[in-house]
Amino acid sequence: MTNKTVKIGNIDVANHKPFVLFGGMNVLESRDMAMQVCEKYVEVTDKLGVPYVFKASFDKANRSSIHSYRGPGMEEGLKIFQELKKTFGVKVIADVHEIYQCNPVAEVVDVIQLPAFLARQTDLVEAMARTGAVINVKKPQFLSPGQMGNIVEKIEECGNDKVILCDRGTNFGYDNLVVDMLGFGVMKKASKGCPVIFDVTHSLQCRDPFGAASGGRREQVTELARAGMAVGIAGLFLEAHPDPNNAKCDGPSALPLSALEGFVVQMKAIDELVKSFPELDTSK
């Protein structure tokens, strides 16, 4: 199988190339915090020589509770993204939830993301594809890895072949997720070699059946990330926060920002080791 390479500016995203860190915060809480988080990621990735794309949401439209914080909204969020790009020279990835958001968001950010809960919505998929932007497709928790090929086909039929796939865990009964390590290879095959990345922090989610917000297992973020990197993937999708216990969204799954450098050191070492091995054909 031939691995496809998707370019985000001068960054190559491919399963056989050095991993790309798609990292940032879950939702934009403030301009100042976004600057703080992005600055730390840039400092660490520049020091370690890891390709980097900043991630955050301007609107968490799928929060469980009507009372939960959603974000600053598209207009203010795009202003923050523009400032981050100007200040730090970073590429940016952000999700869209409505068709009307696709074009204005694609004019500012470098990658638009299709949320897991919306990945089967054909009208939204087509609108995103027609922007011509790089698209990151989150695998729905309820969808098998092999079905991701159908979503890729929808995008490609619109003339856009710049597709990245992202695993963020699979339903394991009610209110829990598990990561199928075999699924990464299945997605590569189903998509004919699209880059596959791993959203480790969202894969740590779990919840109280009657609760209004997701819980998480951030104490296990390193071990789960190590396992995903060992498969040989194009990138890691990570959320970090200066104070996870007081984050406005998904704090229980977020890596403490102070632990970022040590974490990335380990991920880079695993990625380099795995990709130094010759490919073995064990299918015969």
UniProtKB/Swiss-Prot annotation:
The keyword Hydrolase belongs to this UniProt entry's keyword annotation: no
Subcellular location: Cytoplasm
Enzyme class: transferase
UniProt GO molecular function: 3-deoxy-8-phosphooctulonate synthase activity
Keywords: Cytoplasm, Lipopolysaccharide biosynthesis, Transferase
Pathway connected to this protein: Carbohydrate biosynthesis; 3-deoxy-D-manno-octulosonate biosynthesis; 3-deoxy-D-manno-octulosonate from D-ribulose 5-phosphate: step 2/3; Bacterial outer membrane biogenesis; lipopolysaccharide biosynthesis
Reaction catalysis annotation: D-arabinose 5-phosphate + phosphoenolpyruvate + H2O = 3-deoxy-alpha-D-manno-2-octulosonate-8-phosphate + phosphate
InterPro entries given in the database record: Aldolase_TIM, DAHP1/KDSA, KDO8P_synthase
Gene Ontology, cellular component aspect: cytoplasm
Principal cellular location given in the protein's record: cytoplasm
GO-annotated biological processes: keto-3-deoxy-D-manno-octulosonic acid biosynthetic process
One Pfam family hit: DAHP_synth_1
Keyword hit for Transferase: yes
Xref: SUPFAM superfamilies: Aldolase
Record EC number: 2.5.1.55
NCBIfam families in UniProt: KDO8P_synth, PRK05198.1, PRK12457.1
PANTHER family: PHOSPHO-2-DEHYDRO-3-DEOXYHEPTONATE ALDOLASE
Family to which this protein belongs: Belongs to the KdsA family.
Name this protein carries in UniProt: 2-dehydro-3-deoxyphosphooctonate aldolase
The species this protein was found in: Actinobacillus succinogenes (strain ATCC 55618 / DSM 22257 / CCUG 43843 / 130Z)
Origin organism lineage: Bacteria, Pseudomonadati, Pseudomonadota, Gammaproteobacteria, Pasteurellales
Encoding gene per record: kdsA
